[in-house]
UniProtKB/Swiss-Prot annotation:
Protein name: Lipid A acyltransferase PagP
Family recorded in the similarity comment: Belongs to the lipid A palmitoyltransferase family.
KW Acyltransferase (keyword) present: yes
Reactions it catalyzes: a lipid A + a 1,2-diacyl-sn-glycero-3-phosphocholine = a hepta-acyl lipid A + a 2-acyl-sn-glycero-3-phosphocholine; a lipid IVA + a 1,2-diacyl-sn-glycero-3-phosphocholine = a lipid IVB + a 2-acyl-sn-glycero-3-phosphocholine; a lipid IIA + a 1,2-diacyl-sn-glycero-3-phosphocholine = a lipid IIB + a 2-acyl-sn-glycero-3-phosphocholine
EC number(s) reported in the record: 2.3.1.251
Length: 192
């Protein structure tokens, strides 16, 4: 019974957290300013309806933080997550990136793990050559794992990237506890 409660709590953690945040934020009665949730849903909808590009995702590496794992565990883990994915994306008027994606890759146990969601990155172009770009943002989506019986699990993770032109090396870090989580995951994203 305790295990079932933990599974349900994990399953609805993101939903409950977002609901609490939305309820606790003050309403801006009579202003034209949108709340963060309306901005988020508008960006997702616009990316779905009006994509500028289609993207190919190629998983590149997973790395289990050695300080957070027993060596006997990391020796058994897969850190070459072959797979692939597809997405659509756009750049907004501020130069920020928005993307919708689905991807499947081999996880730490060499089992298939699907993930899909929305990603956003604030983008900087620090060099005179505007093709070079750096990004920092988040992804919100859903994944499912073999060791969790493929029950859909919401994810909210940081994103970072470095790119040149249509090729971007994008990455995230999955936080966790000892021998669980604490995984760096990166992929190439090619924009067409």
């Amino acid at each position: 019974m305790v295990v079932n409660v933990v599974i349900v709590a994990k399953k609805y953690f993101l939903f409950i957290t977002l609901l609490i945040i939305q309820v606790s934020l003050p309403a801006h009665a009579g202003t034209d300013e949108k709340g963060w949730f309306n901005t988020f849903t508008d960006n997702v909808a616009e990316t779905w309806r009006e994509p500028e590009h289609y993207d190919l995702y190629i998983p590149a590496i997973t790395w289990h933080a050695r300080f957070a794992y027993d060596k006997r565990k990391t020796d058994r883990y897969n850190e070459r997550p072959w797979g692939g994915g597809f997405g659509q994306s756009r750049w907004d008027e501020k130069g920020n990136w928005h993307g919708l994606y689905v991807m499947a890759f081999k996880d730490s146990w060499n089992k298939w793990e699907p993930i899909g969601g929305y990603g956003w990155e604030s983008t900087w172009r620090p060099l005179p050559d505007d093709n070079f770009h750096l990004g920092l943002g988040f992804t919100a989506g859903v994944t499912a794992r073999d060791n969790w019986k493929y029950i859909p699990v919401p994810v909210l993770l940081p994103l970072a990237s470095i790119g040149y032109g249509p090729a971007t090396f994008q990455m995230t870090y999955i936080p966790g506890t000892y021998n669980n989580g604490n995984v760096y995951f990166a992929w190439m994203r090619f924009q067409f």
